[in-house]
Amino acid sequence: LSLEPLQRTLIGRRLLQVSRESLRRIFFLSYAWRLTHKKKFLARCEDELLTVSKFNDWNPSHFLDVAEMTMAVSIGYDWLFNDLQAKSREVISKAIIEKGLTPSQDSKYNGWLRGSNNWNQVCNAGITFGALAVYESQPAASLALIERAIKSIAIPMKEYAPDGNYKEGYSYWGYGTSFNVLFNNVLEKIFGTDFNLNSQPGFMQTASFYENLIGPSGQPFSYSDCGGIEGLQPAMFWFADKLKDPSLLFIEKKYLQTSKFNVKSNRLLPAAMLWANGISVKDIKEPAQKIWNGNGGNEVTMMRTSWWGGKEIYVGYKGGSPSVSHGHMDAGSFV
């Protein structure tokens, strides 16, 4: 509430840090408003929405910036819709259409539609949130974008086959898979179906891949581009709920117990609250599986003697190729 309004300030060619902070602020504030109905959250969230809606653009030359900003504004617009001033709704919806949806149809900016990495997942999720937010006023155009996204996002989802291995490694699993989960989840909420996306080979197994990457030290097996421990991962709660497998949250439970979640950087944190509904902490037990093997284009194997206790032995080994997205010359590396 005390932070200065965001400005359209690029770092190099990117507005991404502003888009991500906008998503964090708007997601947190709109969630707080719906939870508490305290006017201070509504007023500040409306200000945030209007501020970014009045930017001259959302930097389509680096489309991740547009995707995250579109998702941010769409969440706020939808969750606050009945409480926003009429003039604000007009400004915000116009921004979603002109600065989010329209540039996604320009071939100069939408090469991600054919990509097989996190860009496809993030951009399709952001644009779909935007299309759903303005669906009532733009039904035909919105439906076309949603149908396009369903076809397009199937491309990177094929990369999870056959076992759930994510080629880009630990850190980018947290990015690409989280936005893929947001995409699948919103389709189910609105249309009552996931359009068979959840049944893509390997996708529902990928939560086990991510959980097994964490060793007894609490650090991940850090191959490919990896910034180290990410902390609480909201998408894991979605998988645990879908699969009715609380053991997928064993590491997340440890993060909660040790406060390893950062409200200043985890812009998707409110989603954990939504997806954790109905999951009891007492039901979260140690996973039975101690060996995980993932085939695909960046093969990896992890094994351990136990999950916690202080005397565990953990081994991680990878094969694969350095040519995958965010890959390194690390075939044969191990921990």
Predicted features by range, described:
Residues 172-335:
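Extended polysaccharide-engagement surfaces of secreted carbohydrate-active enzymes
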Residues 3-220, 226-227:
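Aromatic-lined, polymer-binding surfaces characteristic
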